[in-house]
Amino acid sequence: MVLSDFDRTLSDEKDNFIIKQEVVEVVNKFSAKFLFFVVTGRERKYMDILAKGLFPTGWIIENGGIIILRDKEIKLVDEKWYKIRKNLAKILDKNGIKYSLGEVIIYVNSAIDYKDKLDKINEAKIEWNRSDAMIMPKNVSKGEAVKILKSILNFEGVTIAIGDSQNDISLFSVADIKVAVANALPEIKAISDIVLDKEDGIGVMRFLEKILNDGSYLEKLIGFRK
């Protein structure tokens, strides 16, 4: 099972995070043979625009808040969260902090200037993706969503996580093999088993192609777990 972040991992910031067609084709080919999940902090409305034509096995969106798997869709929050979120939105409004409401999370773009104010929030958890912040329930993360996904699938095989930023740390914590793209933050590279020599989607694409085309490389990856 491969679990890949999207922004600056499958997609390139220079392309406004629209995934390259060549990357789409390889991911779709890979997903026809192996389990492949996109695990992103992005909201659904943006993925519909940025990932056109991409057909992975499934999705984990909003930083672990929602799992989408074939005909199943699971929100990993209860109704209490929405009352908390409403109050948090009022606090952000009062402080003049612009935000986007997802189906679960509150997303604050370019939030680093508000870090001191955001750090005072006690009712929720803040996770960072470079300079952007995601406000979410304390029990929600990419890693927790992957645990639930594996339970749903009764999956006991090897898990490979690919990422670049702070909010991928929880994803890496539940993976057998941790892979950083070449443009990953230093702290992500430091905890990775493999650092790719290419950036963003091209790096992921080459990695997937190697698994598809080189049986000995796949065996080597499986050996990481032993």
From Swiss-Prot:
Function: Catalyzes the dephosphorylation of 2-phosphoglycolate.
Pfam families, A to Z: Hydrolase_3
Residues involved in Mg(2+) binding: 5, 7, 164, 168
Major enzyme class: hydrolase
Active site: 5
Cofactor annotation: Mg(2+)
Family: Belongs to the archaeal SPP-like hydrolase family.
Superkingdom: Archaea
EC number of this enzyme: 3.1.3.18
Catalytic activity: 2-phosphoglycolate + H2O = glycolate + phosphate
GO cellular component, one term: cytosol
Species of origin: Sulfurisphaera tokodaii (strain DSM 16993 / JCM 10545 / NBRC 100140 / 7) (Sulfolobus tokodaii)
Residues binding substrate, per UniProt: 142
GO-annotated molecular function: magnesium ion binding; phosphoglycolate phosphatase activity
InterPro entries reported for this sequence: HAD-like_sf, HAD-SF_hydro_IIB, HAD_sf, PGPase
Descriptive protein name: Phosphoglycolate phosphatase
Keywords: Carbohydrate metabolism, Hydrolase, Magnesium, Metal-binding
